[in-house]
Regions:
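A generic "binding-loop/recognition-motif" signal
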Residues: 43, 62, 78-79, 88
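Short acidic-glycine-tyrosine-enriched beta hairpin
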Residues: 62-76
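Short beta-strand His + acidic residue motifs that chelate non-heme Fe in jelly-roll/DSBH
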Residues: 36-37, 57-58, 74, 80-86
Length: 113
């Protein structure tokens, strides 16, 4: 069993994980965006859950609204990015299956836990 406290601080932060999955937070400030057409995870599916704020996700060129309670699955190799179109921080809890990053928050090559 692993336990982590979810704290939303600006940027991307790994919370916890094991060889099969990983949890992280992503906070995007108003008017800012992260990711884009070159942002993919070759070796991991990514689930995002919007805790608060609003914006949009662009996945393989299609735009989807993000609001509190949104849950989206981004499959491995799908290009994606997120934009905060609201007035408050966009707080996202994200899960990778399998892990996509090492402890230093560097992306892992496909197939490496």
């Amino acid at each position: 069993m692993k336990h982590a406290k979810v704290a939303y601080v600006p940027g991307f932060h790994i919370l916890t994980g094991d060889a099969r999955s990983q949890a992280a937070t992503l906070v995007i400030q108003p008017g800012k965006h992260v990711g884009g057409p070159d942002n993919t995870h070759r070796g991991a599916d990514q689930w995002i859950y919007v805790e608060s704020g609003s914006g949009e996700a662009t996945i393989d060129g299609a735009t989807h609204p993000l609001e509190k309670g949104s849950l989206i699955l981004i499959q491995r190799t799908q290009a994606h990015g997120f934009r905060n179109s609201g007035q408050t921080p966009l707080n996202i809890l994200t899960f990778y299956v399998p892990p996509a990053y090492d402890e230093s928050e560097n992306e892992l090559p496909a197939g490496q836990p």
